[in-house]
Amino acid sequence: MAQRFKELYLQTIVPKLKDEFGYKNSHQVPEIKKIVINRGLGDASQNAKILDSSLNELSIIAGQRGVVTRSKKAIAGFKLRDKMAVGISVTLRGDRMYSFLDRLINLALPRIRDFQGISPKSFDGCGNYSLGLEEQLMFPEIDYDKIDQVRGMDISIVTTCSNNEEGVALLKNFGMPFKA
């Protein structure tokens, strides 16, 4: 699956973007550098099972084991001590990144209830796109009977684009379903 999206990028998207933006060199064409999947787990500090099940779910979705993010300092109001587990993060690059992007665009996003497309306003000004998902059940790898609680995740697609216009064009050519 990963090779399909990489081939699509090299064979189709690079020439399209070269014509559209007038790049002289194919190395000027923006590309996706990495995809970061993040899940904040505020309640994991009290319950270690939540952390383990979330780590397993994220590794099934991403195809790569996640890293536990820990708190930097203690905050008494949140019942949080220093270096306590507060989330999970996975950074995908290369073939795994293209494979995840393919599954996200073609399998997961269409399975969202009442889906009309994703917002084109979630770019950061430099062509990077952030997307929040409210549940993990949209991924076909997740078994409904094995989840203990519905949890969302944040997905950031980091590109080499210099502005939002290039980012929209790049992701649209990959087939990202933006709202009209």
UniProtKB/Swiss-Prot annotation:
A Gene Ontology BP annotation from the UniProt entry: translation
What would be one Pfam family of this protein? Answer: Ribosomal_L5_C
Q: Does the keyword Protein biosynthesis apply?
A: no
Molecular-function GO terms, alphabetical:
rRNA binding; structural constituent of ribosome
Gene3D superfamilies, from UniProt? 3.30.1440.10
User: Would you identify the family this protein belongs to, as annotated?
Assistant: Belongs to the universal ribosomal protein uL5 family.
Q: What does this protein do?
A: Binds 5S rRNA, forms part of the central protuberance of the 50S subunit.
What name does the UniProt record give this protein? Large ribosomal subunit protein uL5c
Record the organism: Oltmannsiellopsis viridis (Marine flagellate)
